[in-house]
Design a protein with these regions (language model features):
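Phosphate-binding glycine-rich loop
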Residues: 66, 70-110, 128
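Conserved PLP-anchoring active-site segment centered on the Schiff-base-forming lysine
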Residues: 104-126, 131, 138-144
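N-terminal "arm"/small-domain region of PLP-dependent enzymes with the aminotransferase-like
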Residues: 2-64, 354
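Conserved PLP-binding catalytic core of the aspartate aminotransferase-like
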Residues: 286, 299-333, 355
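PLP-dependent enzyme catalytic core of the Aspartate aminotransferase-like
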Residues: 167, 331-332, 342-376
Length: 376
């Protein structure tokens, strides 16, 4: 089922949508023991054993300053992503890159954000004085005319899990050559519904056998990538901004030194040095997600939204809000969900969950079955 609680409009000033006031993985707010955490989009499972040992061996490195701009990780990431080193900026998670983009292009005066959306896009634009144009994800077509300026688009989207078809996205990009697009690919490893834009950011003259026919197509596109989600390290904050060198240079002018800590750099070097073990094919995860969605629909009769990833939205009945459901689940069952009420374009009745192990999925299914029958 598609997202329908969306709107287009204009916004100035502060709202209650600030992400720092509500986000996933907020178990620290509760004294109750957590049996299962569905609130974060991070891939379920333990920290990679090899990475754990590596970080333990490198912990003494924190007695020294990190590289001012994480140069070693920048070079390794560039090779992994198939671009030149000066096309990459290492950031303290994707969140830092979002705020840097809003600062670097604040002179454009206006930003477009597709809704529903990760609230950090709004927070960053508001901080740097950009007027915001809201564009409904559902009403976006290849021929939609955006007002230009800075455009934030999450591909696949958070919190809906929906992805724009590649042809749709490319037509949109080519139709707005004067806008600066920030394409957040934080969850690209978790979908088969779209492909990364990175091959289109390669320099045409790069002597690589796999350079795409349209390499260098988009001098106005900044792609954001993350190691947080697929590598299960949200506490270390490792992100990347990737684009043509002119875009990266503008971002770098706004970036403070030493924003990426020593252990984060070490983790990134280890991850890129150990290849695809950190990026398993998504087929099994997506199949588990689809099966669990059907179980939830059958158990609750609630609205469970379609997704192209391993996370998705659910809408509660009007008898209780997602916030009330969240409190009930954590206090009665030790289960944590993501109240999605602070995502612009959603309602107080939306919550988001991410697929976990089959055992944990069953725990939430049964708890929600009980709520659907007896209330809170």
């Amino acid at each position: 089922m598609s997202i329908c609680h969306l709107f287009t409009g204009r916004y100035k000033g502060r709202t209650s949508h600030n992400m720092i006031e509500g986000h996933g993985d907020d178990a620290y707010r509760y004294k109750n023991p957590i049996r299962a955490d569905f609130s974060s989009n991070v891939l379920y499972g333990p920290l990679d054993a090899g990475l754990r040992v590596h970080l333990q061996e490198k912990v003494a490195a924190v007695t020294h300053y990190p590289e001012a701009s994480a140069q070693s990780l920048q070079a390794v990431a560039a090779e992994a992503y198939g671009v030149a080193s000066d096309q990459v900026l290492v950031t303290n998670g994707v969140t830092e890159a979002i705020y840097l983009a809003a600062e670097a292009w604040r002179y454009l005066k206006i930003a477009t954000i597709l809704t529903p959306a990760f609230a950090e896009y709004e927070d960053a634009c508001r901080l740097h004085g950009l007027d915001i144009h809201w564009q409904s994800w559902n009403s976006l077509t290849p021929d939609t005319r955006l007002p230009g300026g800075l455009v934030f688009l999450c591909q696949p989207n958070n919190p809906t899990g929906a992805a724009l078809p590649p042809a749709h996205l490319h037509r949109l990009l080519r139709g707005h050559p004067d806008a600066v697009f920030v394409i957040d690919e934080s969850y690209i490893e978790f979908t088969q519904a779209t492909t990364s834009l990175l091959p289109h950011l390669m320099l045409p003259h790069m002597a690589l056998p796999y350079v795409a026919p349209h390499a260098g197509d988009y001098p106005n596109v900044l792609v954001l990538r993350s190691l947080t989600k697929s590598c299960r390290i949200p506490g270390l904050r490792i992100g990347f901004a990737i684009g043509q060198s002119s875009l990266i240079s503008r971002l770098r002018e706004c970036k403070m030194p030493w924003s990426v800590n020593r252990l984060a750099i070490e983790a990134g070097l280890y991850i890129f040095g150990h290849g695809q073990q950190f990026w398993p094919p998504p087929e099994q995860l997506l199949a588990e997600t689809a099966a669990w969605q059907e179980e939830l629909r059958s158990a609750t009769r609630w609205r469970v939204y379609d997704t192209d990833t391993h996370y998705f939205l659910v809408e509660t009945p009007v008898a209780f809000t997602a916030a009330a459901l969240k409190e009930h689940l954590i206090t009665r069952h030790g289960l944590l969900i993501r109240d999605a009420g602070n995502f612009r374009g959603l309602t107080p009745y939306h919550f988001r969950v991410a697929c976990q192990s089959s055992e944990h999925n069953r725990l939430l299914t049964e708890a929600l079955r009980e709520c659907s029958r007896t209330g809170l």
